């Protein structure tokens, strides 16, 4: 019973930590990831989602800003939730810069034809909802403002302004060009043992442009914290066994 409880606590700790990654496992590549990886994961019963990240210069009138664009597919993120500023909390523009702390949970990714922007983009480009801004060769409509993302600042990098869009709109932006700095991410989530099986399978098929990351790989400080927590739980389990043995010994002495 004690071992079962400890295992449940360990599993919960890992799952909570994985929200910082947005998934249980990532395959990251500077090249397009072959469909075979997502197909294998899905055949094992795992959930998948894709994300393509790259820097881009965006503008609104006289305001220009270098941002990180994230083109995502349905299901993103697989762990954690995207928090959006509520409709009444975002009054921003030349005459108003007030932003309240109220927010709501996103239930999907941005619909095709729209984008979501974070607070830095909101402030520096002086945007309001329903503004249309140029994203490469197309225009997309701002429909939501992002308050928080589960995988923001993994490894304490990528802290710049961010725009999220639907991957279905990526081609018409014409932003993916030869020599572009692009990161292709495949998110995977599911039962821990099955995820490990997929990781073992994928590890044998990676090329030099690809790598696998779990939360312990991406965040060394999280790895250290998890290891300390696991040691504490193991000590707690040992202490429980010792206390139970002592209680049994005392009970036996009373009846002998």
State what each model feature region is:
Residues 1-242, 248, 254:
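Membrane transport/envelope proteins' first extracytoplasmic loop
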């Amino acid at each position: 019973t004690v071992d079962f409880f400890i295992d449940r606590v360990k599993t919960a700790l890992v799952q909570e930590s994985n929200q910082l990654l947005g998934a249980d496992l990532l395959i990251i590549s500077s090249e397009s990831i072959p469909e075979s990886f997502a197909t294998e994961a899905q055949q094992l019963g795992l959930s998948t989602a894709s994300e393509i990240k790259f820097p881009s210069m965006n503008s609104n009138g006289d305001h220009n800003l270098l941002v990180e664009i994230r083109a995502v597919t349905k299901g993103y993120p697989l762990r954690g939730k995207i928090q959006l500023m509520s409709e009444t909390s975002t009054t921003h523009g030349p005459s108003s810069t007030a932003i309240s702390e109220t927010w709501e949970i996103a239930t999907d990714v941005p619909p095709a034809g729209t984008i979501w922007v974070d607070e830095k983009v909101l402030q520096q480009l002086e945007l309001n909802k329903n503004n249309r801004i140029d994203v490469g060769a197309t225009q997309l409509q701002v429909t939501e403002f992002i308050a928080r993302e589960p995988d923001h600042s993994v490894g304490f990098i990528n802290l710049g302004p961010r725009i999220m869009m639907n991957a279905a709109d990526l081609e018409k932006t014409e932003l993916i060009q030869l020599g572009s700095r692009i990161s292709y991410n495949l998110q995977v989530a599911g039962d821990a043992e099955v995820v490990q099986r997929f990781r073992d399978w994928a590890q044998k098929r990676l090329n030099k442009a690809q790598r696998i990351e779990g939360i312990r790989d991406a965040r060394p400080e999280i790895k250290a914290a998890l290891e300390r927590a696991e040691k504490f739980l193991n000590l707690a389990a040992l202490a429980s066994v010792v206390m139970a043995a002592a209680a049994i010994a005392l009970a036996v002495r009373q009846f002998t």
